Structures are given as structure tokens and as C-alpha cells.
């Protein structure tokens, strides 16, 4: 299965957000929508929640609504793809510094946790691998850096953290969106 819906570019989404005076970066908006999808959002209720959290409950104009719909659809498709196609929307390119990417990652993770927490209010009670991943995400959201650090080393470490965050998001999606068997569906061994 190929990913038919593609994410809007970071720059085009930044422009649309700025034009609508929404004080989120594209990374933060993608993190928020990703968190809601990973938390189990399955209907159009995501729009109202995004409006409430980012625009005082007021719906966006079509100029921003359409790119956000595209962002939502592409993200949902990537999360549901068995090939683990999901990627974080973080700025890239020659003009983007490693510090810009680190800041964007922090914003993405913070908003991912916000979106996830809105749909999974008992997040603190989650155990096992998923609980550990959520705890790690909380720590990653607070990571800082020293601008005197070796940028090449920081860039390599950042790529490893981005990959960890990507896998943690997929793990949350699996945990909170896959149907769990109900009691009658769990078969007990039959004694003959």
C-alpha cells in the first residue's frame, strides 16, 4: 500500500498558520494532530479539539482548514500503514540549523503529549513499554542543548532521538487504537 496522501510541506504549513495568526509551528501542529490520532481519535471531532486548543474554539478559514485536513489524512494513513511510514514533520534543509530541529522536536513532542492526553486522560497510569515510552517522551520534551556543543555530534544524537520518538508514537498508536478483545472473546483452554 502506498501513501497516497502526502504531508504539506513545512514551509507551506508555516505560511498558512502565520496567515491565520495561529501561534503554533508546523511541528507543533503535526505533533498535536499525531497525538490525537495515536490517542484514538477516529472521527471529525479532531477539528473542534484543534480549534479549541489553538484558536479559542473558532474554526479556521479554508486557507488553513484544507492544509490541516491534508495533514490529518496523511498522518492517519501513515500511522495505519503496516510499513511504518509515519514520520515527524520537522524542518529540514541546508538553511535549518540543528538547534532549529531540536527546538522543533521539543515542540512536536510537547504537543504530541497534549493531543494524546486529551484523548487518553489516564496517561499517567499506562504501564509496560508504552508507559515507559510516554515517560521518555516527557523527558525528551524537556531536553535542552548547549549552543557550544559539537553540531555534528548533536545532529547525530538528534536523529537518534527523532527515530525513538517516531517509534514511540507508533507504539502509542498501536496501544490506544487497536481493538482489545473483550472477556467473551478471550478463549480459555478447554479441559477434555
UniProtKB/Swiss-Prot annotation:
Name of this chain's protein: UPF0149 protein YE3397
Residue pairs linked by disulfide bridges in the UniProt entry: none
InterPro entries (UniProt xref): YgfB-like, YgfB-like_sf
Species this chain originates from: Yersinia enterocolitica serotype O:8 / biotype 1B (strain NCTC 13174 / 8081)
GO cellular component: cytosol
Family to which the UniProt record says this protein belongs: Belongs to the UPF0149 family.
Amino acid at each position: 500500500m502506498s501513501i497516497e496522501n502526502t504531508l504539506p510541506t513545512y514551509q507551506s504549513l508555516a505560511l498558512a498558520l502565520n496567515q491565520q495568526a495561529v501561534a503554533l509551528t508546523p511541528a507543533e501542529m503535526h505533533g498535536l494532530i499525531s497525538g490525537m490520532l495515536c490517542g484514538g481519535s477516529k472521527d471529525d471531532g479532531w477539528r473542534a479539539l484543534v480549534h479549541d486548543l489553538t484558536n479559542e474554539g473558532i474554526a479556521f478559514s479554508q486557507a488553513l482548514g484544507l492544509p490541516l485536513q491534508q495533514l490529518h489524512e496523511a498522518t492517519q494513513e501513515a500511522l495505519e500503514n503496516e510499513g511504518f511510514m509515519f514520520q515527524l514533520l520537522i524542518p529540514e534543509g541546508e538553511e535549518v540549523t540543528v538547534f532549529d530541529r531540536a527546538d522543533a522536536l521539543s515542540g512536536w513532542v510537547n504537543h504530541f503529549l497534549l493531543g494524546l492526553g486529551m484523548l487518553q486522560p489516564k496517561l499517567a497510569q499506562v504501564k509496560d513499554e508504552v508507559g515507559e515510552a510516554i515517560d521518555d517522551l516527557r523527558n525528551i520534551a524537556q531536553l535542552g542543548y548547549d549552543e557550544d556543543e559539537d553540531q555534528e555530534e548533536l545532529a547525530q544524537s538528534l536523529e537518534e532521538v527523532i527515530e525513538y520518538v517516531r517509534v514511540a508514537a507508533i507504539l502509542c498508536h498501536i496501544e490506544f487504537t487497536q481493538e482489545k478483545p473483550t472477556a467473551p472473546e478471550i478463549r480459555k483452554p478447554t479441559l477434555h
